[in-house]
């Protein structure tokens, strides 16, 4: 069997001086971080603040909700199924730092419909004493893997709706509330607000068999990069010396790029995933929702923008950073050098594995072929 993408990254044996220098720089940076010389203040304080989490009834979304509740946040979860929401909200309450002081709410909604997202934000604002939520974290969506040609056009559209449009609709609804300008007489100091997308490393490195899913995640990443620039127009309005009409608070965008996550959705995905796809990602060790949530929250607390949850994902990000903002110019530059060297071998190997699979097994006849 040919090596998979992650195994190539893991098993690479750098011998050239340039690669050794990159590893040395990364090792030094890691030591510095471990000993706290570059410690930063928490940029994601959630105690007493209201957080909306879409897809919060299970998987990563539920884990995020539980961990933010542990930190003292008021939690609103959104999903379609009432029973799952009711069960999840009890688990989230059980994780609360102070269940008598914190507040919890759930809303059943179809996020593929923009009017539903508007309804959610209106309902949360009323529930939150007339104030919009402070943080919105988009975790909704599921993956339907398959070969592009073997997948129906309707499924391709459904994946774009479920993955991209649920996030875009949610972002549009909350930003239209957050970014309404107010007069100077009504302006008062407010903590920074946060909009968080949950994407996938497939937005960095597409893999055969994810044709319905990867384009939607790539679109989400493009939206995030665009908003990261556009939001500065509104943040800049608050820096005006005249303090004319401006938005009430600064807003920061973050995007999380997990790999496999052990969840009910992952189990369903595995049942229909092409065998070639499983081979290509065989060394990808899925993480638990709790682990992904913890790593993501810690990264947001450090103020990071594009967030990966394991080393392989970091290397994949390094190969596709392009013009995206860096978390650390030093670390991301070093990772980018390493990634570009590694992917000189990775990309040809992915294509070779696909070719050899076709030579051995012939034309696929179903999404699970």
Curated annotation (Swiss-Prot):
GO biological process, one term: sphingolipid biosynthetic process
Gene Ontology CC terms, in alphabetical order: endoplasmic reticulum membrane
Motif GXSXG location, chain numbering: 55-59
SUPFAM superfamilies for the chain: NAD(P)-binding Rossmann-fold domains
Enzyme class: oxidoreductase
Membrane-spanning segments: 195-215
InterPro entries in the record: KDSR-like, NAD(P)-bd_dom_sf, SDR_fam
Origin: domain of life: Eukaryota
Reaction equation(s) it catalyzes: sphinganine + NADP(+) = 3-oxosphinganine + NADPH + H(+)
UniProt-annotated binding residues for NADPH: 55, 57, 59, 80, 84, 110-111
Residues reported to bind NADP(+): 52, 110, 213, 217, 261, 263, 272
Documented EC number(s): 1.1.1.102
Biological role: Catalyzes the reduction of 3'-oxosphinganine (3-ketodihydrosphingosine/KDS) to sphinganine (dihydrosphingosine/DHS), the second step of de novo sphingolipid biosynthesis.
Protein name as catalogued: 3-ketodihydrosphingosine reductase tsc10
Species of the source: Emericella nidulans (strain FGSC A4 / ATCC 38163 / CBS 112.46 / NRRL 194 / M139)
Gene: tsc10
